[in-house]
Amino acid sequence: MAAISPWLSSPQSFSNPRVTITDSRRCSSISAAISVLDSSNEEQHRISSRDHVGMKRRDVMLQIASSVFFLPLAISPAFAETNASEAFRVYTDETNKFEISIPQDWQVGQAEPNGFKSITAFYPQETSTSNVSIAITGLGPDFTRMESFGKVEAFAETLVSGLDRSWQKPVGVTAKLIDSRASKGFYYIEYTLQNPGEARKHLYSAIGMATNGWYNRLYTVTGQFTDEESAEQSSKIQKTVKSFRFI
């Protein structure tokens, strides 16, 4: 009994092993819980960041899509440099730092931005639905190059599917992707749009990114013509869109 009594006579010796074990387990559980919470918070932050970027990406895509429906109405004349080259002349915008070759007899105008930084239109003198427009959109710091929107194939699919309303009842505009490719920092996308009962429109876009020294800007150059105008305008419009470059 004498051998046992020292262990029993000490409440500290009696209780500490159990308390130590319990506290150890409790601490381990708390540490694990904190670790899970930290991981959860980090994951929520990552998801929130992705959602934020995703929302801004969708906003930009909506602006790109809306630029497609621009029509050269109620515009004011704009100055164009006339460095003639055969049937084309070079239009230079020193403010927005770009130049583009347009058909010699086409008119130039500025439209109300309406959410854009700038919209410039080029179109024939005669009555026509053919035109080329350049819409400039401001971008946040998350977008530093075209790949920020994903690969060109996915970008094109998202853009065109966002325009398609053929699934609606009654049926809306039908949008079909024809081709997409990336070249020298630009995304080139070719597709068609057709409203019920109207002529099909062919659209050819060049989309690129540049900075003015303060923030990034997205330039969407879109040329369009109908099936009826295809033979006359197709080559002109594609040449015009492809000639766009930053200065």
From Swiss-Prot:
Name the species this protein comes from: Arabidopsis thaliana
Q: Which GO terms describe its biological process?
A: photosynthesis
Could you state a single Gene Ontology molecular function term? calcium ion binding
- Which residue pairs form cystines in this protein? none
| Chief location bin | plastid
Q: Specify the inducers.
A: Down-regulated by photosynthetic redox signals.
Classification of source organism: Eukaryota, Viridiplantae, Streptophyta, Embryophyta, Tracheophyta
User: A single GO CC term, please?
Assistant: chloroplast thylakoid lumen
Q: What is this protein called?
A: PsbP domain-containing protein 3, chloroplastic
